[in-house]
Amino acid sequence: PVSTSQAVVGSIVGVGIMQKQVTLTGLDKIIICWIGTPIGGCILSIILYLVLARIINRFQPSWAGFDFIMRTGLIITGCYGAYALGANNVANVTGVFYGAGFLSIKTAALIGGVSIALGILTFSKGVMKTVGRGIVKLDAYSALIVVLSNAITVHIYAVIGVPVSTSQAVVGAVLGIGLLKRAEALRKRAIVGVFSGWIATPFIAGLVSISIYFVTHLTYVG
């Protein structure tokens, strides 16, 4: 799982370098939020895990009651997570078209939403496996906490107006659960791979955008 917001920002910076119009205004804020997203997701998941566990244990529901709570909670938090995803991540790709004057906000949002649904139906399987099992195995309660932490974290940044990564938030939340259970439960190789991807993504995206800009400029403009 890598960050679309990092890829988009890296691509924009790459094009800005080629056009000699790079502005660093606001970039420091975005980078700080990139760092804060997984940390925030991690801390929030730990807090929610402990607080909700205490509340559930206090009422001591039956197995049937606990199962109902988990199923209902996963549906509700899943819908909230999808809402937060749409509120923040759709703008990562479609925002540049709105800024260039090609699309209205509503049209860009609609196209982005449909494209996200298409991506889910095609190539999301591998990312799901990495997040759901690759870092640490999640039970129903842990999954509920991860989705809720991810949704709250991403929603906060959407309100602020900063593009952040849902993948960073959810991985941070999963790490929080892993730390709570025990450090040995974490699969370090998967974690290193994820963090390496986060570091490399903006640079690779920037290089790709520079290359594409150079080729198209040479072919159609030069």
For the regions a language model picked out, list residue spans one by one.
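Alpha-helical transmembrane segments and immediately membrane-proximal extracytoplasmic
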Residues: P1-G222
